[in-house]
């Protein structure tokens, strides 16, 4: 068969508690051959912008990670229990007001779409991590953003 083609990608956390160390490690990974950066889920465009500005001279494309929130409880769990996840208070408050169920999922999609709209001109693309078995949320996030083929 045809030869396979591979490239090396790496992860990065724009909201890292030790941001300087995160950027230094990212530089090392790129120097070692990483050709693409995939971020942890981000909920604040300013947080991503800072990282994009800092690594722009390295010339490596970035895929932003988007994880649509499914409920207030989900937002609080991710923020308080998952290391490295930082969800701004304003986002958690929006999810609190939305509660749970379909209305909360709509708000989670809206938040992810707002993030994508805010950064789409600065990133190579996005990857969507829908909550468990909520694949339709990924489609709702990208609806209207994809170029027609």
Regions found by a protein language model. Give the residues of each.
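Active-site-adjacent beta->alpha loops and helix N-cap segments on the catalytic face
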Residues: 18-21, 41-59, 133-144
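A structural motif corresponding to the C-terminal end of an alpha-helix
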Residues: 1, 32, 115-125
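Glycine-rich phosphate/diphosphate-binding loops and the adjacent beta-loop-alpha structural elements
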Residues: 101-102, 106, 121-127
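Conserved, mostly hydrophobic/aromatic
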Residues: 29, 33, 64, 126
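Active-site glycine-rich loop that binds ribose-phosphate moieties when present
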Residues: 17-32
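Active-site pocket-lining/capping segments in soluble small-molecule metabolic enzymes
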Residues: 1-4, 11-16, 57-115, 132, ...
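Catalytic beta/alpha-barrel core
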Residues: 35-44, 127-130
């Amino acid at each position: 068969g045809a030869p396979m083609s591979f490239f090396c990608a790496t992860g990065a956390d724009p909201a890292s508690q030790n941001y300087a160390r995160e950027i230094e490690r990212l530089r090392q990974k790129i120097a070692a051959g990483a050709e693409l950066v995939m971020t942890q889920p981000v909920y604040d465009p300013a947080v991503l912008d800072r990282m994009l500005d800092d690594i722009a001279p390295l010339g490596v494309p970035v895929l932003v990670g988007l994880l649509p929130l499914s409920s207030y409880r989900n937002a609080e769990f991710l923020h308080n229990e998952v290391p490295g996840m930082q969800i701004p208070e304003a986002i958690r408050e929006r999810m609190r007001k939305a509660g749970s169920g379909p209305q909360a999922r709509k708000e989670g999609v809206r938040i992810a779409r707002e993030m994508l709209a805010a950064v789409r001109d600065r990133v190579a693309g996005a990857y969507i991590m829908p909550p468990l078995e909520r694949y339709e949320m990924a489609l709702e996030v990208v609806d209207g953003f994809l170029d027609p083929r």
